Amino acid sequence: MRKVVFGGANSLDNYFARKDDAVDWLMWSDEVGKIMADYFKTFDTIVMGRRTYEVAVRSGHGGGSYPGMKTYVFSRTLKPRSTKNLEITSEDVAEVVGRLKQEEGKDICIMGGGLLAKPLFEANLIDEIGFNIHPVLLGSGIPLFHEMNHQIDLELIDCKTLKTGCVLVTYRVKPPAKKSATARSAKSANRARSSRTQTKAK
């Protein structure tokens, strides 16, 4: 099964872009360039939202697609489009990524902000997180992570300090914990006690 990886760059105070989508604060170097080149060799599919797609188009990534990769853009406002390397769709992102994960191929890169990643985390589809944390506090901007419906536990795989002062961290997403029989029994007992209390109150 293919691995789904959520990755990118963020400020120390949890923003991945300014409010106007600007990323002028990102620190680029030959070291980062090599790391990113090796990183993208592990993927053949990129998933992004409308805002990330539009930034990619403005930066010259050939219509938002990346060489040798299939790019999926999820948007409710862009006109649907399907070519060999680019798919713009309004389908449910979790359903599509769930299907892609079962197919043969390299890993899948989730690129962009937390609004796109949120339903994927909640559906337990993301396997790994990798971020280049920058030594800057933006103060405001577009947040990387948003409130989710359950806790996500992580295991540190790698941590590397770059010459720019950035810290590159990689985490494995742990599978959701299964509720034990004891916990289920306790929950049932609590419901039973609550029901008896309500009955007596009547």
Predicted segments, located by residue:
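Enzymes that bind and transform nitrogen-containing heteroaromatic metabolites
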Residues: 1-202
